[in-house]
Amino acid sequence: MQKRKLGQGGPEIAPLVFGGNVFGWTADEASSFKLLDRFVERGFNAIDTADVYSSWGPGLSGGESETVIGNWLARRGRRDDVVLMTKVGMWDQRKGLSAANIAAAVDDSLRRLRTDHIDVYFAHLDDAEVPLAETLGAFGRLVEAGKVRTLGASNHDAKRLREALAVSKEQGLPRYEVIQPPYNLYDRSFESELAAVAQKHGLGVVSYFSLASGFLTGKYRSVEDLKGKAREGFLQGYFDARGLALLEVLRKVAEEAKATPAQVALAWLMSRPALTAPIASATSLEQLDDILGAADLQLSSSALDALDAAGKAAA
């Protein structure tokens, strides 16, 4: 499997990133271990998480995902086989991007992950209350200390990203090398400005909501199918006329390609020139094998064009 380099100075990763928000939430520790085992056995290596995962779940408070991953790493001894990505700034217990908060949060994450370094450390959410120089300076000290290898920015708009890159250049600070925006066939907002910034500066891009919280798997055909599902709140907004029309095209392409809708949606993302790799999650081995199959799927140019047109119509 051909690896893809994250930006100019980041690590090389396989073309699909495991979204670790499910660990300790919709996948218990035993199930999570099986999923992670299968993931690396298939040759994939990048795992994305955050300190806040999954504080929104009933009875959860945050830190669960990192803890599960750390326990798996300790049990399996596979730290050198994976690229760990985690984030700081969104969790109520460690909110914001002040220097003090970043310094405390990274040590907490390292402890939960049971490792001495994080491969890609993201600012989870922009913090306009803190000067960019303070945030980037704090991140730079983590790089100097060996606690972090590469920096990333999640949920930053194009204007703030350009400002951050300028501050890094002007003040000789490490720059954001990777960005993590929402991006999928339905949500094309990344293409308006961020994609151009990423390509101009040679940034790596790993997208979240790559399957639109499961909408693009095709397993939900109506709002009624969502009742009682853990992701019901995330999914409801996709079931409009535009989303349903997109699903029809997605199912048609999948049938013609002898693939699943999830594989097609991910393969389309993998073909996008500005994207390094999409992030996707699974809670069962069957689901995981399905999404990993996207890496082997080569869609025809006509299929890609049909998906692109349908997605733009839904944007």
Where on the chain are the PLM-derived regions?
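Beta/alpha (TIM)-barrel catalytic core signal, keyed to glycine-rich beta->alpha loops juxtaposed to Asp/Glu
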Residues: D126-A315
